[in-house]
A protein has these predicted regions:
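Solenoidal tandem-repeat scaffolds enriched in leucines and small polar residues
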Residues: 187-280
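Hydrophobic membrane-insertion alpha-helices, especially the h-region
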Residues: 51-68
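Residue-level detector of conserved catalytic or cofactor/ligand-binding positions
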Residues: 358-367
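Repeated scaffold domains used in trafficking and secretory/extracellular systems
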Residues: 87-96, 124-136, 163-175, 207-217, ...
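Structured, soluble extracytoplasmic/luminal domains of envelope-associated proteins
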Residues: 119-173, 297-300, 307-314, 318-325, ...
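Structural motif
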Residues: 108-110, 146-150, 185-191, 232-244, ...
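Aromatic (tryptophan-biased) beta-strands that constitute blades/sheets of beta-rich domains
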Residues: 73-90, 113, 117-126, 156-162, ...
Length: 367
């Protein structure tokens, strides 16, 4: 009996051990399955995060590649789409207006589409017409004369007969125009609507603030930029003044909200480039920023003599003479924050240079 009892206890002990082993094995299998499920869930979450990130990275790469392509591409040939014979090639001039060609001479202005079909044509009488275009608006002034016409893509919108000879006229995208008039001892800077009505006039003196060299208008049609030049202690000095004809400038003397003096510097040309303005100097350029009260943003000075300038809303270009026999010229193009984008030597004789509306490439007219 004792032997049987011992045998039963051993068998019971063995069965209990096998049961515990089986339970442990089953528990381990369940734990592994749970672990596998956790790993799969983590992988799914990781994929859900990585997929949009990958899409964004691909999109950024495509945009960057496209940007670099547009910035660095160059054109080495062209295709003539259509030609037209012009009888008076000496006095007729051309520029762009609303994606079409604005053709003007001493007695007529017309808008021509890309098939050289005349959209409209109107007449006037001038001796030395000079045009300025901004967006869908334009002004044609008789330089050293007294006539101006304002126009948009639909035709002439207004005319003006001035009391003094016209030095220069500029227009803004909103249709506001400004003109420098030479009255001898005094000069006038007049401000006009696109219909030709006078908004404001400002008389200037050669001694103070100086002789107006150029005028430019902001896109908002409220701020006017003027470059003056005067002689101070036998030194040529330039003064850049910003006039505000809105509420901001109503309490300021002569509506001048900001002004900057540059000793020993000549500023023959100024221009608004979108929200920024630039003063093109004989030693480089200065950029201004601010819609109502413009402030100096950056000045870029160069040592070489500048022989040409060109620009659009995103770029400022300078051309210098090059000492190299193989390359006569050097072109430098800057962003409107003053950073140099590229510099390139070239050897193409030209009479005019500008930024093209297509691809922002520089266009040259051969001599």
């Amino acid at each position: 009996n004792t032997f049987k009892n011992i045998k039963k206890k051993l068998r019971r002990k063995r069965l209990l051990a096998e049961k515990r082993h089986l339970e442990k094995a089953q528990a381990g299998a369940g734990g592994n399955e749970a672990a596998r499920r956790k790993i799969k869930a983590a992988l799914r979450r990781k994929k859900a995060v990585l997929k949009p990130v990958a899409v964004i990275l691909i999109a950024v790469f495509v945009v960057l590649a496209g940007f670099l392509f547009l910035e660095k591409r160059t054109y080495r040939n062209y295709k003539v789409q259509v030609t037209s014979e012009q009888e008076d090639t000496v006095s007729t001039q051309y520029t762009y207006l609303s994606g079409k060609i604005l053709r003007y001479s001493s007695d007529e202005v017309s808008l021509v589409n890309n098939k050289l079909e005349t959209v409209w044509s109107q007449t006037y009488d001038m001796q030395n017409p000079v045009a300025d275009v901004c967006g869908d608006c334009a002004v044609i002034a008789d330089k050293d004369g007294t006539s101006m016409v304002f126009l948009d893509k639909n035709g002439i919108t207004g005319t003006v007969s001035t009391s003094y000879s016209i030095v220069k006229a500029k227009v803004s995208k909103t249709g506001m125009a400004a003109a420098i008039l030479d009255g001898g001892d005094h000069t006038w800077i007049n401000f006009y609507n696109l219909d030709g009505s006078l908004v404001a006039e400002n008389q200037t003196n050669i001694q103070d603030p100086g002789y107006p060299m150029d005028v430019a208008l902001a896109d908002n049609g409220v701020v006017m930029m003027v470059a003056y030049q005067f002689v101070d202690s036998s030194e040529t000095t330039s003064y850049i003044a910003f006039y505000n004809f809105g509420e901001v400038g109503q309490n300021e003397d002569d509506r001048i909200v900001s002004g900057y003096t540059y000793d020993g510097v000549v500023v023959p040309q100024i221009q608004y480039l979108g929200s920024n303005a630039v003063a093109l100097r004989d030693d480089g350029f200065t950029i201004y920023s601010g819609r109502q009260i413009p402030k100096e943003l950056k000045t870029v000075q160069v040592e070489q003599e500048i022989i040409s300038t060109f620009y659009d809303e995103n770029n400022i270009g300078l051309v210098f003479k090059n000492d190299s026999k193989d390359k006569q010229y050097t072109m430098q193009v800057y962003a409107t924050d003053g950073k140099l984008k590229f510099s390139k030597d070239f050897n193409i004789p030209y009479t005019t240079i500008r930024m093209s509306e297509i691809g922002r490439a520089s266009c040259r007219e051969r001599v």
